[in-house]
Amino acid sequence: MSKLVAGMVGLSLVAALPVAAGAAVLGPDAAACGGNGPAMLVHIDGFKKRTGTLRIQSYGGNPTRYFEKGSWLRRIDVAVPNSGAADICVPVPANGNYAVSVRHDVDGSGKTGMNDGGGMSGNPKLSLMDVIFKRKPNPDKVQVNVHGVTRVPVVLNYVQGGSFGPLAMASR
């Protein structure tokens, strides 16, 4: 009986401990997500390989210009973490509506290739033809309302045969 009571006391002590913090926030502006923002904490998951670099770009202003070349507000390049998801802090000028794009440059060449992955805020479904012809998703599907520090999940997509999408969970 005393072992049962001791075990229950031990379990209650473990339950009272604070939840362990997640992965360290990466990027040159990591401190901006430790306060009140405004910032996006971009949570990137679904890596094909643990090599290369991530390029995160934020967009604001006119939603029809999201993802246009050269229209980004902030660009951050970081190494792919050895394990787990990547949390990147992206500060924004003020609370409001924004979008994010992420590119996983698998070989670190600085150029987009067929092995590279990508994703966007809102995780819109894109076809391989959308990627080939550089068609942008509807702004309503990718827009994020930032107030303070706002978490933005992004699942990476890769070319797989004749399609473009997230890797199967079993292959991670």
Predicted regions: what is each one?
Residues V78-G84, N145-V146:
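Short proline/glycine- and polar residue-rich coil/turn motifs
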Residues A85-V92:
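Exposed aromatic-hydrophobic patches
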